[in-house]
Curated annotation (Swiss-Prot):
Primary location: cytoplasm
Subcellular localization: Cytoplasm
Protein name (record): Elongation factor G
Biological process, per Gene Ontology: ribosome disassembly
Lineage top rank: taxon: Bacteria
Keywords of the record: Cytoplasm, Elongation factor, GTP-binding, Nucleotide-binding, Protein biosynthesis
Length: 699
């Protein structure tokens, strides 16, 4: 079977946004207008096609990034293939956003015209910057009370530090929003309400907007000619680019992430979606427009590139594992190069295991179609893979490569979980392992002392949903303990420790002496090990044992047994015995050496500090600030946003549990908040003593 669509006609993109900016509704409209969804699903009544997990339908928030393939005829009448990845907008799921951005070529950033740039918008925007993803902006909900397109444009500059190139102006706002002015064609599009947005009339620009349209077209041209010398010179000599030249320049600037074309509309009221789809074709990149993906050649360890071509060796990245009720475990993968046929054997170069592709599926949010082969640029779901987890590379066994890995944040919150009955016990273990394979930001461990199962994640909602999924999908009933904070420990001063390990009673003896300087690592939170041994005081082959010994005890600090951050260890001297010394002896010595030193090097407890943003009506500002202060919060600033006030604060996670209930009652349900992990900071001594007493079992 040959390739149906040329790779130049692919658009792999996602929709990223704050929690309520209307992402699922916008995706639904795209599926409706591209003919993939016959009934428009509304999030309000839990029927959206992309939101296919039961809980998403109940909570009205998107949790799993479902991948959907659909098609759209552009302005030129030629059909293009869209692979759309739906991403969640809730802070507890930023890991989902990050991993979908990793495999996208472009994105549409959605703003709520009333709220503008919100905290989560900033978070996903920063993640997109990290992966250099070209973005367009859609200012949604123009029909909402308080909708202000021009304020949103300003906020993109002030809050995101980005350049928005305005491509359309709104005609009317709030309940009077009728259509848009197209600043390239310089005409107006007015939607017909009765046709569910499928039809619109092209009319002249209304008189009261003509001057503004001229002003914004001038700004548009000024911005785009800056990226091309010839166009700039012509412009300065009074020659304006024609419409197709403007489009070509906007495309180039968008793909090079110099600026972001901005559109407006209301997905809910079916206005503005089709011009947005045309813009996806016109301005977002195809797989060949972006730089080739880099990787490491497994044989030579040299950096190599894989270009978006069917002729290159097969390489793909697994970016999501999902449990499908009909097919079992599905691995979503983006094919960067080469071709993949059903039944082929591929190499997982991260796990060093071969995998066989049993079935290959093309997904449409929750319906699926079996396919025989797939090509560069495709996003496919593979059934039958046993070893692969998120972030692994799959490739041609004869041309092995490891593509750039994804980084996943450490969980900040943990809870103990117990099965309700004996029958649930075994099922719970299986369920937790399956969920952990799907979600790399979710960890499962057993507490060595209490024997309890501990689950850790990115926030309360994250863990709630996983426990809920366990009940629904795996029929496991479990009781959940109170959430606990993931504290850390560190050292605050330099200390030199000399330790000798000797065991000479019967059989082979053990001997190792180490002298190590421990100090805070100035370069960050990682552990750093150095050896400054000269003259063979410790033979070279024993030095890895010293490092391994220290690393093995970093997981349990001296104060309350929490993992340690930011330690630097330098081995400066030691001694060995010709017969009794071994790697193991040095491992034991360095382990004991660090345990001794950690107590004397100013051990300190650290706690996760969250960046909290509260949006509240003015009447409740005093109460909100007072409450945040009582939670050991530090107010970073406040600003007016429309009729509301935005309060930014840094607050210890330990004091934020059940905050949502407090905020609701304090503001009669009118205030909202978002919370993100920001950094680790020392715990005040009075609080630290309580924590130590609690975790050292003295209470």
């Amino acid at each position: 079977m040959a390739r149906e669509y040329k790779i130049e006609d692919y658009r792999n993109f996602g929709i990223m946004a704050h929690i309520d900016a209307g992402k699922t509704t916008t995706t639904e409209r795209i599926l409706y207008y591209t003919g993939k969804s016959h009934k428009i699903g509304e999030v309000h009544d839990g029927a959206a096609t992309m939101d296919w997990m039961e809980q998403e339908q109940e909570r009205g928030i998107t949790i799993t990034s479902a991948a959907t393939t659909t098609f759209w005829k552009g302005r030129d009448g030629k059909s293009r293939r869209f692979n759309i990845i739906d991403t969640p907008g809730h802070v507890d799921f930023t890991i989902e956003v990050e991993r979908s951005l990793r495999v996208l070529d472009g994105a549409i950033a959605l703003l709520d015209a009333n709220a503008g740039v919100e905290p989560q918008t900033e978070t996903v925007w920063r993640q997109a910057e990290k992966y250099n993803v070209p973005r367009m902006i859609f200012c949604n909900k123009m029909d909402k009370t308080g909708a202000d397109f021009y304020r949103s444009v300003e906020m993109i500059k002030t809050r995101l530090g980005a350049t928005a190139v305005v491509m359309q102006l709104p005609i009317g706002a709030e309940s009077d929003f009728k259509g848009v002015v197209d600043l390239i064609e310089m005409n107006a599009l007015i939607w017909r309400d009765e046709s569910l947005g499928a039809q619109w009339d092209v009319v002249e620009i209304p008189d009261d907007l003509k001057e503004k349209a001229e002003e914004y077209r001038e700004k548009l041209i000024e911005t785009v000619v800056e990226i091309d010398e010839a166009a700039m010179e012509a412009y300065l000599e009074g020659q304006y680019p024609d419409n197709e030249q403007i489009r070509a320049l906007v495309r180039r600037g968008t793909i090079d992430v110099k600026f972001h074309p901005m559109f407006c509309g209301t997905a809910f009221k079916n206005k503005g979606v089709q011009p947005l789809l045309d813009a996806v074709v016109d301005y977002l990149p195809s797989p060949v427009d972006i730089p080739a993906i880099k990787g490491i050649d497994v044989k030579t360890e040299a950096e190599i590139e894989r270009h978006a071509s069917d002729e290159e060796p097969l390489s793909m990245l697994a970016f999501k594992i999902m449990n499908d009720p009909f097919v079992g475990s599905l691995t979503f993968a983006r094919i960067y190069s080469g071709k993949l046929e059903k039944g082929t054997s591929v190499m997982n170069t991260v796990k060093e295991k071969r995998e066989r592709v049993g079935r290959m599926l093309q997904m449409h949010s929750n319906s699926r179609e079996d396919i025989e082969e797939a090509f560069a640029g495709d996003i496919v779901a593979l059934a039958g893979l046993k070893e692969t987890t998120t972030g692994d590379t799959l490739c041609d066994p004869l041309k092995q490569v490891i593509l750039e890995r994804m980084e996943f944040p450490e969980p900040v919150i943990q809870i103990a979980i117990e099965p309700k009955t004996k029958g649930d016990q075994e099922k719970m273990g299986l369920a937790l392992n399956r969920l952990a394979a799907e979600d790399p930001s979710f960890r499962v461990k057993t507490d060595e002392e209490s024997g309890q199962t501990i689950i850790a994640g990115m926030g309360e909602l994250h863990l709630d949903i996983l426990v809920d999924r366990m009940r629904r999908e795996f029929k496991v009933e479990a009781t959940v303990g109170a959430p606990q904070v993931a504290y850390r420990e560190t050292i605050t001063r330099q200390h030199e420790e000399d330790y000798t390990h000797k065991k000479q009673s019967g059989g082979t003896g053990q001997f190792a002496r180490v002298k190590i300087v421990f100090e805070p690592n100035p370069e960050g939170e990682e552990f750093k090990f150095e050896s400054k041994i000269v003259g063979g005081a410790v033979p070279k082959e024993y030095i890895p044992g010293v490092q391994k010994g220290i690393e093995s005890v970093l997981s349990s600090g001296p104060l309350a047994g929490f993992p340690m951050l930011g330690v630097k260890a330098t081995l400066i001297d030691g001694a060995f015995h010709d017969v009794d010394s071994s790697v193991l002896a040095f491992e034991i010595a360095s382990r004991a050496c660090f345990r001794e030193a950690a107590k004397k090097a100013g051990a300190q407890l650290l706690e996760p500090i969250m960046k909290v943003e509260v949006v509240t009506p003015e009447d409740y500002v005093g109460d909100v600030i007072g409450d945040l202060n009582s939670r050991r919060g530090q107010i970073q600033g406040q600003e007016a946003r429309g009729v509301a006030v935005v309060i930014n604060a840094h607050v210890p996670l330990a004091n934020m549990f059940k905050y949502v209930d407090n905020l609701r009652s304090m503001s009669q349900g009118r205030a909202q908040y978002t919370m993100l992990f920001d950094h680790y900071a020392p715990v005040p001594s009075n609080v630290a003593q309580e924590i130590q007493a609690k975790y050292s079992g003295q209470k």
